[in-house]
């Protein structure tokens, strides 16, 4: 029996533990061949596949060793609304994204520099899982995994206020001094024309 026909027999689920199994090119004595046939006939040395075997060649796939992805196949989508007070709470947002849950971050309770750091951190995690991100309002951001489609029909990018239009050498305005809302890094690059 050639190697290819033996592979076909294994894949097709044929009983490959028959006398053709010994047709390898080994030098054997005739009395060893007779002993092997008698053991095979009595079922002594060779084990036959049973129904309790984890390697069922002929039956369907049991799926007992398959680990599902979190959130796949669930009937409803989850949205987590988070109002963090410090950057230390950001890993929870990343974990929710990894579990294929949408996260809305309301960063109004954070200091502006910490809020900017938090937005950049969660945006990086969202990018790593091929997710989507959207600025919903002032200091409010939506981060969604790749299984969620985010569309925005009422947002006009040209009419959106931007803090990038200000010169870096000029004196900051009063809105920047009082803790204006953070602008995510991807908004800065879009407005900058890059």
Swiss-Prot record:
GO terms for biological process: division septum assembly; FtsZ-dependent cytokinesis. It comes from the Bacteria. GO terms for cellular component: cytoplasm. Keywords: Cell cycle, Cell division, Cytoplasm, Septation. It is found in: Cytoplasm. InterPro entries: Cell_div_SepF (IPR023052), Cell_div_SepF/SepF-rel (IPR007561), SepF-like_sf (IPR038594). Residues 35-54, 159-194 are annotated as: Disordered. The keyword Cell cycle applies. It holds the Pfam family SepF. Belongs to the SepF family. Cell division protein that is part of the divisome complex and is recruited early to the Z-ring. Probably stimulates Z-ring formation, perhaps through the cross-linking of FtsZ protofilaments. Its function overlaps with FtsA. Homodimer. Interacts with FtsZ. This is Cell division protein SepF. It comes from Prochlorococcus marinus (strain MIT 9303).
């Amino acid at each position: 029996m050639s190697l290819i026909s033996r592979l076909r027999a294994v894949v097709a689920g044929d009983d490959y533990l028959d006398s053709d199994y010994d047709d390898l090119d080994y030098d054997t004595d005739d009395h060893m061949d007779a002993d092997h046939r008698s053991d095979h006939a009595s079922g002594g040395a060779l084990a036959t596949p049973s129904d309790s075997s984890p390697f069922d060649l002929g039956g369907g796939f049991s799926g007992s060793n398959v680990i599902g992805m979190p959130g796949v196949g669930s009937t409803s989508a989850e949205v987590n609304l988070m109002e963090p007070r410090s950057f230390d709470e950001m890993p929870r947002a990343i974990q929710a994204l990894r579990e294929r849950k949408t996260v809305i971050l309301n960063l109004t309770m954070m200091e502006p520099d910490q809020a900017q750091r938090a937005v950049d951190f969660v945006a990086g995690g969202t990018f790593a899982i091929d997710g989507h991100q959207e600025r919903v309002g002032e200091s409010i951001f939506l981060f969604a995994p790749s299984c969620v489609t985010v569309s925005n029909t009422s947002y006009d990018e040209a009419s959106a206020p931007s803090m990038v239009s200000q010169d870096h050498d000029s004196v900051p305005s009063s809105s920047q001094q009082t803790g204006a809302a953070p602008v995510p890094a991807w908004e800065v690059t879009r407005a900058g024309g890059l």
